[in-house]
């Protein structure tokens, strides 16, 4: 169901309303960043704001929207006719909301917005909270085998009625956290952002009229839907295209898991079928994927060169069907753990890129690496127990027109400043730099990961980490090479250096130990021999590529700080040109464990 559109706005008015909504959403973000207390929200910017129409369709959001349907689960419990101005609703229950939120630390708040007593929109904000209980400080552990170990679950509840807060509900929730004051501050910031967003929406309606604003909502959705449908029609031929990508492990068992996607297009309709994906994992890499997520992934990629197109629910309208199978990695059954769902979410992205590469003759981005988190849970003789949870950046895949992004945690988030990390977490950051040669070679180079040296200052500590793409590096496309894998080493320059598990928890460390975390790079795109030699030289001088890789991977011979053109031409003339689509350790067209993948999946939809 969509909103009625009785009064179409002029193009000028539509742009004014777009600007007002985007400004209001940015103002909500600024409020959260200033007022929140936890590092995840205040420094890393792990939060999200949006406006939705009265049917719950996303109208305005951040540029990276991977949330599910945020309103339907609330409306099931609290019908629209029971809502009042000043009400505020709250949840983090992944299973209870069908994947509206993807893991428990992401706490969602939604406020209905009224005009003259009639509901016309919702203002929404969520943030990743520092600790919500569970088996370990920080609530996320690679060793979790049940969602009950990952913190308290809040079903959709009304936390505010006509502006009056239900303090009892908040008190119960904060009592379950190891950091209640920090949690309370974050909740206040997010709730205030919703109130601010509702106020700005009301101002917009008072300025333009509710009918015009609702019509603008519909126009924005229709514009985005039309843009994605046009891109699909122009760039994806009718047919079936399949790809499978693998996750290193689930941290509980040593086996790898795969995400399997079959993309089907015919008669102007598009279907994305994940039903042949692996069974749900024992460990916490499960991802209860709302249907909107792969639709937004497709829309974000296909419309990324159209900056005037809004990232909104129009993407959902443009894709007819998402198919999953209960009990699989992307449709797990309760109470499978979910804390590391990003490992599977990123593999959904790379599987999508793989199918698009097959559909378009290689005109798709190479695979990104999965962003990294580590946990350092300290203990000192004076009884203090500092908690360090730090997200580390990786390399993203090369695009068809540009290098991959270097050293990025997630496109809409930030890295901790070193000064902040040292002051807040009781650690010393002794090195932070680019993981040289980690970006897959190509006409467009994959993004590079990073190297970060962390010195333990607590008397003792337990270390946990989630670092993927070590066994299964990010693949290259259309002749590009795969990115380099990651690694974790304790005391790398000492007498007894030791590699430790890249998916583990509870690893004992002592005061003075140094942990070197080396994160993976993204895949490259296109034949490395086609990269301009001067670009390769610039990468060498900037520390992204070594002289050895310049010669071995790109065929570029250097003489000091310049290109030896004659030697380069001779070396490149002797290099074999890749003829297969993908690269991961070797060039290939069909997946090793899926020889039928270049056409249709023989197992899609079967148990």
Question: Whereabouts are the PLM-identified features?
Answer:
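Glycine/proline-enriched, intrinsically flexible loops and inter-domain linkers
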Residues: 2-85, 90, 94-115, 119-606
